[in-house]
Amino acid sequence: MDTKTVVNALWLYDDLLDLYGDWGNLLVLKSYFGKMNIEFNIIKKSIGDDFDLEVADFVYIGPGKFKNLCAASRDILRYKDDIKDAIESGKCFLVTGNARLMFGNSFEDTGKNLYEGLGIFDYTGHESGNVKISDVVAFPVYSETPLKSYGFINRTSYIEGN
């Protein structure tokens, strides 16, 4: 018997946080899941929309212009406890680019205006207004064995802390 499994991906702030076509991350996942006969549903939610983390197997938040990130950050705070609980229970989140700023304690713009973060990680984000482009080599903290990862950075923000 051929059983088809379903994965529900919750894409938060798809209309605001999709800089550089990061939508491609989800298309790649959809393609690979499809090859394994797993249906990959994408549920899009944005500012003012209610969402249920319980129905999502996977949550994606991409990068965006800083003003869009600020708007999304004000909205996502209403789910602060739900997001913390979901992460602590093992829910999978893929947060790319400057969207990671929302998961720290706070972040600030170039004028030093402070925005509250979700407080998942103990860091503070800063928007510099200057573009930094470079290659990066990293060793993910979640790997029990050294796992060398290569990437590319194109950013205007940075974090301080862990």
Which residues does each predicted region cover?
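N-terminal beta1-alpha1 cap of cysteine-dependent amidohydrolase-like domains
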Residues: 1-85
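Generic secondary-structure signature for well-ordered alpha-helical cores
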Residues: 34-38, 88, 123, 159
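Cysteine-nucleophile active-site neighborhood
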Residues: 66-146
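Short, acidic Gly/Pro/Ser/Thr-rich loop/turn segments
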Residues: 16-19, 66-68, 125-128, 158-161
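Amide-donor transfer/coupling interface in amidating biosynthetic enzymes
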Residues: 1-11, 127-162
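Fold-independent oxyanion-binding glycine-rich loops
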Residues: 14, 45-47, 62-64, 96-99, ...
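Surface-exposed loop/turn and secondary-structure junction residues enriched for glycine/proline
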Residues: 20-26, 56, 105-106, 110, ...
